[in-house]
Amino acid sequence: MYIRWGRATCPERSKYIYKGQMVGPDYRVPGGGSNYLCMHDDPDYSSKAFSGKFFSNLQAAFYGSGSLLRHRQIPCVVCESKQRVTQLMIPAKTKCPMGSGWVLEYEGILMSPWTGNSADRDTYRGSYVCVDKDVESTTNRTSENAGHRLLPVSAACTGDGIFADCPPYRTDVALSCAVCSK
């Protein structure tokens, strides 16, 4: 089982479970989770649901700058790999390990949250996710100000040891990723 970020369909070799939209914590306030969720397009609410005015909020995720779909909402789909139970996201690779039974589910671009300004960067962290390289959006809904922004990730090759292996890594080049299963 895996989440295919940036797409609303599963590859042919996988079984569709549900589709939805990518959401994350509200980066403007402290608290909440740090992971992303694939929220179902048709939510159910418990009969024992809490009500009130104090909640931890989720924000829709949007593609950030540098993307062909800039400011568009990010779709997701939950897929089940037939007869494969182990899933692995490999950063900085476009293929799965050779000769060990791994199957490529999809190739993508490594992305993480953008926080907006320097004050936010010290207080907010999010997950790294592999967004399908053939990105699409959920609808024509756009947002330039609200929501959760994802940007491609690159290595920080500054020459002062921040990222030790430069080369082969390069600054200002988006890192690839592969989602594999076996």
Regions found by a protein language model. Name each.
Residues M1-K182:
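Composition-driven recognition of glycine/serine/threonine/acidic- and proline-rich low-complexity segments
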